[in-house]
Design a protein with these regions (language model features):
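A short acidic-Thr-Gly-centered motif at the start of a beta-strand
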Residues: 1-12
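Short hydrophobic beta-strand that contains or immediately precedes a catalytic carboxylate
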Residues: 15-17
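Aspartic protease core domain of the pepsin/retropepsin superfamily
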Residues: 19, 23-146
């Protein structure tokens, strides 16, 4: 499901929520475009397996970033650790199981909705159908390259 949260003050439009992933990833290109100070990157040696078919990659560090879902009158904010992925993707970031757990979020894949508790009731975030299809096509093209 492709969503558009605010991450570290930036409204991102292609963030994949993937309940099958054990990590939150942010891609090097996204970090560069967000202008994040390189001194905030923590050294990590985490290895990714299964993110890109047939490849194994080592992250280039990690960042603690604030993620916000909802509207100005009913929102949730959580600080999540993101591992910096050294490869390309059609997405700007990937939120895994830890994000689902921290936000107490429940995905509804058939209707492309993500629901979570907020201070003023349930927050419902709609997924972007067009972006979801494009992201899937892009991932398939990247897999075919390798």
């Amino acid at each position: 499901m492709v969503l558009d949260p605010i991450i570290n003050g930036y409204h991102l439009t292609r963030v994949l929520m993937d309940g099958g992933s054990g990590l939150n990833l942010i891609y090097q290109d996204t970090v560069r475009k967000m202008g994040i100070d390189r001194t905030k990157i923590r050294h990590r040696t985490t290895t990714f397996k299964g993110v890109v078919p047939g490849l194994e990659a080592r992250c280039t560090g990690s960042l603690l970033l604030e993620v916000v879902f909802g509207s100005s009158d009913n929102f949730r904010s959580e600080r999540l650790t993101f591992y910096i992925a050294p490869f390309r993707s059609g997405d700007q970031a990937l939120l895994g199981r830890t994000a689902f757990a921290r936000f107490n979020a429940i995905p509804h894949y058939a209707s492309l909705k993500l629901k979570m508790p907020g201070p003023c009731g349930t927050i419902t975030v709609s997924g972007n159908t067009e972006c979801s299809l494009r992201a899937e096509e892009h991932a398939a093209a990247l897999a075919a390259e390798h």
